[in-house]
Amino acid sequence: MVIVLGIDPGTASTGYGVVLATGSRLAALDGGVISTDKREPLERRLARIHARVTDLIKEHEPAAVAIEDLFFGQNARTAFSVGQARGAVMLSAGLTGVPCFS
C-alpha cells in the first residue's frame, strides 16, 4: 500500500488529490481545492497554501508528494506565480520529511 498526495499548484486555486495504490489498484481517498482570496497579499496566500498542504500531509501521511511540473505559454507572470505556489508546497513536503516529485 502506498499513499500519494498529488498537487496542481496555483496561487488562486491549488488542486489536490490523495490516492491509495494497492498493487495495480488505485483508490481516491480525498481531493479538493485550496482557494485563496485575490485581494489578500501574496505572502498570506502562500502561507495558506503551505498550511493546508502541511495539514493534508499530517492527515494522510503520504509516502510522497507528486507536484505538477511548471508549464506556461506566453505568460511569464503566471508561471512565476505558479512557481511560488510550487515552492510553498515543496516547503510543506520538505519540513515534514516527505519526498516531493514532479
Model feature map: region roles:
Residues 1-102:
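Phosphate- and other anionic-substrate recognition elements at nucleic-acid/protein interfaces
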